[in-house]
Amino acid sequence: MAVKVEPGTVLVMNTHYVNASSEPIEADARINLYSLPAEKVKTEAGMLFYYNPFIRVPENGEASARMRCIVQDDISLVRVQSHMHRRGVGFAAFLGDSAGANQQEIYTTTEWERVPAKAFSPMLQIKAGQTLDYRCDYKNPEARTVTQGQSAKDEMCMLIGPYFPRNAALENCANDKGEHTGTWIGSGTATCGETLGCVVGAKSNDVFYGCIVDSCPGSATAVSDVLLCQMSDGHGACQASCPGADCESCVIQACGTQISACQAAKCQ
């Protein structure tokens, strides 16, 4: 079993460091990679790399980020771990049915720095149609709002784990067309209609992220469906118009079903 790396692929080892002392520190990170002939690989493995971009933690406040992904194929999960930055105070991941119900906790931690990886023995068998649902909890001691991003000044919410056999699409919570299929689950009280109005009026990414965080859990499917339709230019129907003057009207028409469902959705 191995992970295949195609010719020309760039491998990036991304590490984060926070120096809380008054003196410089020397950072060091190393990794060992081992290769074997392609003809000896019987099964190709992959890496789940779920990333939830909808994070907004108010100044001196608390917040959560939650996302649910459908696993499209039968897979074996080797191990799993979280990734958050220093405001992360809790993480939990669950395996559930296609509706996200009947959940079984598969991983939990309160660590953001020395993150434990949970190895499954025997490996965790996940059936096609089951879901992985994970949540990151944050506590922000700073006098500024913190949102998602790549630096230590920002936050992240990720579920990571090697698995097999590989399906490149499901690694990023996407379908075979490359479209994200996850469900973003807010922790607020806003209905889908209110959330959509917030998104349309958002003038910055910070506000946009907050719109989703503030949505109610009961509207999660409707919120995610309309967002995914809009962000994919009407699931590709408006590619010829976007970007352009006719993009907005095309997307509104192409996403009419999702918009109507959103306006009708209630918090339950």
PLM features: residue spans?
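Beta-strand-centric surfaces of beta-sandwich/beta-rich domains
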Residues: 1-76, 81-185
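Mature extracellular/luminal domains of secreted and GPI-anchored eukaryotic proteins, especially small
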Residues: 183-268
